[in-house]
Amino acid sequence: MAAPSFKAWRDYAFLQLCLHHVERIEEKLGISGVETTVCSWSRKADPAQGLAGARFDLVLVRRDHVIHLCEIRYSLPPSDLLPAYWQELRERREAFRRATSTKKALQLTLITAHRLDSQALAEDIQCQLTLDDLF
């Protein structure tokens, strides 16, 4: 089992790798021909309003009215914790929708080091990319 400091470094390094390969991510998503704005998004927690903090490190806002909310993680929680993790992603997607008042289609996009089998993926995950897709 890896030390927490190593896991934090590994996740950060993987995030930086992905952010340096956004053009390749767009290509693998099949959107390289679509005008896209690349950004991140976060919202601070507001306990008075009962709002949890939320963040997406990579957001691809497409000219064709679709937004990819990219979840970038080197590894995911163990399979017994995945349902709660998928629920958290749904809540973050809805937080984004409320905070931005967007009418665009929101697609959850998962970028991880290793591919999950289709049974482990939540039905809400529209796209999945792996480390191999970046090279």
Regions found by a protein language model. Give the residues of each.
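A cross-kingdom feature that marks ATP-driven nucleic-acid transaction machinery
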Residues: 1-135
